[in-house]
Swiss-Prot record:
This is UDP-N-acetylmuramate--L-alanine ligase. It catalyses: UDP-N-acetyl-alpha-D-muramate + L-alanine + ATP = UDP-N-acetyl-alpha-D-muramoyl-L-alanine + ADP + phosphate + H(+). InterPro entries: Mur-like_cat_sf, Mur_ligase_C, Mur_ligase_C_dom_sf, Mur_ligase_cen, Mur_ligase_N, MurCDEF_pg_biosynth, UDP-N-AcMur_Ala_ligase_MurC. Cell wall formation. Pathway: Cell wall biogenesis; peptidoglycan biosynthesis. ATP binds at residues 122-128.
Length: 487
């Protein structure tokens, strides 16, 4: 349980698990604002090295002395309770010393408190949409602060302390902590059951988004994707309640026609996929502005990415950024690390990596891959999938199988358990048994790359998919492929 004062004293902040995607971003902003930052993590990493270079003191390993062994005690200890157990020695030391322990979301809320917050929430697509919003608002000549769950390819960072009045952030619903925020603009990309290990029921998971909608500031906007049944239903419920905030929708023409009672701020009239991504014609009808049609481009393949781009553009424009400049910025967006990230080509085989770890995300990335294959007259799609969490694998085995069956061939790795202990009788084969395409189960991680190169042919597209260590295989597959070619 957190012990949060009314106002958090961030002057000497200690962060447990400082190298994680969310924690490292907050640390970067704290350092840029002049606060003293210490922290710990289980191993060195690129983010830990970067934080040290920026002025943070980071210890490897968790030890009570990291909290109480310095000349001065920290004024606050920050953690992610989803990732760090309550009996962690640093948390125990903080409790015994009377140091407040808060969640990372509480600190992020404090950092946003003097800014106009633009938050991106939803089961899927948060990182990509947040990233596009950042590059779009930056292209409009503004300098927003931002905190993202992934690393912007071009900027090489996941966070920034800006001079402007806007703060753009990804709002993580996994443990309900996004209820700490008070956004002026909140985008909901989609809502469907996930994180049932925390919420218990689908109803509880959906209900947390209704509560999040109440956090939008007076005069603010809740912007929901009309193509997603869950997000559209939320928009309808909030409108029916007749209370703040103003509810707007975005999405395809077909979806807008299905929801005529939800004012559409942006309607995609046409989407044209090609080898460079997707071009689209969009009708914007933003409050206080004349209706206008604009051509947009999103360089990352997939209809889901086009929807994310439209969401980012709409939110930026609602905060006063110049619409045409935001559109130009999004067109120039070159992706986020581990979101349909191109790693290279070996022997005519192209290798991509993606963080997808929910059936809907897997469906989206494989659909995007099929669009890419069709646009470039390429060969087959080979998916290398590592399930994430035993509970998620059990709950969604059939859904994962349907999604992965979009590939021509699948290599299944062992489950990446993360915070969970193994469950007897549960491994990746419960997905494989339901696949309708050719598949292989490879429990030996060190043998995967060689097996994939043995399967792949020139023209094929290989996708490494999952939230765990599978990302390490993208470059290893390329290395094996080049060795096989004698390169």
């Amino acid at each position: 349980m957190t012990t949060q004062p009314e106002q958090i004293d961030l002057s000497r902040t200690h962060m447990v698990g400082i190298g994680g995607a969310g924690m490292s971003g907050i640390a970067r902003i704290l350092l840029a604002r002049g606060y003293s930052v210490t922290g710990s993590d289980m191993k060195d990493s690129r983010s830990v090295l970067a934080l040290r270079a920026a002025g943070a003191e980071v210890a490897i390993g968790h030890d009570a002395a990291n909290v109480t062994g310095g000349a001065e005690l920290p004024t606050v200890v920050v953690t992610s309770f989803a990732a760090i157990p309550k009996d962690n020695p640093e948390l125990t030391a903080a409790r015994e010393a009377g140091i407040p322990i808060v969640r990372r979301s509480d600190v992020l809320a404090e950092l946003m408190s003097d800014r106009r917050a633009f938050l991106l929430a939803g089961t899927h697509g948060k990182t990509s949409t947040t990233s596009m919003a950042v590059v779009g608002v930056q292209a409009a000549g503004l300098d927003p602060s931002f905190a993202i769950g992934g690393q912007l390819n071009r900027a090489g960072t996941n966070a920034h302390h800006g001079t402007g009045e806007i703060f753009i952030a990804e709002a993580d619903e996994s443990d309900g902590s996004f209820l700490s925020y008070s956004p002026e603009v909140a985008v909901i990309t989609n809502i469907e059951p996930d994180h049932l290990d925390y919420y218990g029921t689908e109803e509880a998971y959906v209900a947390i988004f209704d509560e999040f909608a109440t956090k939008v500031t007076p005069g603010g906007y809740l912007v929901c994707c009309l193509d997603d049944p869950g997000a559209a239903a939320l928009a309808a419920r909030v409108r029916a309640a007749g209370t703040a905030p103003t509810v707007l929708g975005y999405g395809s023409r077909a979806a807008a026609d299905q929801h005529p009672d939800i004012p559409a701020a942006a309607i995609i009239e046409e989407m044209i996929p090609d080898a460079r991504g997707t071009a689209a014609k969009v009708r914007f009808n933003l409050p206080g502005q004349e209706e206008r049609y604009e051509d947009i481009r999103v360089a990352i393949p997939g209809a889901h990415m086009t929807l994310n781009g439209v969401a980012a553009i709409t939110g930026g424009a609602l905060l006063g950024a110049d619409l045409e400049k935001v559109i130009a910025g999004v067109a120039d967006f070159d992706g986020v690390r581990r979101r349909f990230e191109y790693h290279g080509e070996a022997g005519g085989v192209r290798v991509y990596d993606d963080y997808a770890h929910h059936p809907t995300e897997v469906t989206a990335v494989l659909t995007a891959a099929k669009e890419l294959v069709e646009a470039t007259d390429a060969g087959r799609i080979i998916a290398v999938f590592q399930p994430h969490l035993y509970s998620r694998t059990m709950n969604f085995a059939s859904e994962f199988a349907r999604a992965l069956s979009l590939a021509d061939e699948v290599v299944l790795l062992d489950i990446f358990g993360a915070r969970e202990q193994p469950v007897e009788g549960v491994d990746s084969r419960i997905i494989g048994e339901k696949l309708t395409c050719e598949w292989h189960f490879q429990p030996d991680f060190s043998a995967v790359a060689e097996q994939v190169i043995g399967i792949a042919k020139p023209g094929d597209v290989v996708l490494t998919i999952g939230a765990g260590t599978v990302t390490m295989l993208a470059d290893e597959i390329l290395r094996c492929g080049r060795e096989a070619q004698g390169e």
